[in-house]
């Protein structure tokens, strides 16, 4: 697979130092350490209970406007034929 010897590791460290600068490396290390620590803490903490989802009756939506459409007839009661 990947055989990283001492020469390859030194080369990688030198390239990183050139890209970020020697002064930024401690800050990068601290940031990565904090991120890993927070990630591990979150993995061990139980997640808060999720709220129970209840069935909500679905509404019909107008396909053009996306507004809810009344399920009742739009014809006034006086104009309806029985």
Swiss-Prot record:
An annotated GO cellular component: TAT protein transport complex
Membrane-spanning residues: 1-21
GO molecular function: protein transmembrane transporter activity
Topological relation to the membrane, as annotated: Single-pass membrane protein
Disordered, as annotated region: 36-82
InterPro entries per UniProt: TatA/B/E, TatA/E
Comp. bias regions, Basic and acidic residues: 36-47
Compartments where located: Cell membrane
Swiss-Prot/TrEMBL keywords: Cell membrane, Membrane, Protein transport, Translocation, Transmembrane, Transmembrane helix, Transport
Predominant cellular place of this UniProt entry's protein: membrane
GO BP term, example: protein transport by the Tat complex
Quaternary structure and partners: Forms a complex with TatC.
Family: Belongs to the TatA/E family.
General function of this protein: Part of the twin-arginine translocation (Tat) system that transports large folded proteins containing a characteristic twin-arginine motif in their signal peptide across membranes. TatA could form the protein-conducting channel of the Tat system.
Protein name: Sec-independent protein translocase protein TatA
Organism: Deinococcus deserti (strain DSM 17065 / CIP 109153 / LMG 22923 / VCD115)
């Amino acid at each position: 697979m990947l055989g990283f010897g001492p020469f390859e590791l030194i080369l990688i460290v030198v390239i990183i130092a050139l890209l970020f600068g020697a002064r930024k490396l401690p800050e990068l290390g601290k940031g990565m350490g904090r991120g890993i620590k927070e990630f591990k803490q979150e993995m061990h903490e139980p997640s808060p209970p999720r709220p129970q989802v209840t069935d909500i009756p679905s509404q019909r939506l107008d396909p053009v406007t996306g507004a809810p459409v009344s399920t009742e007839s739009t014809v006034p009661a006086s104009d309806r034929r029985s």
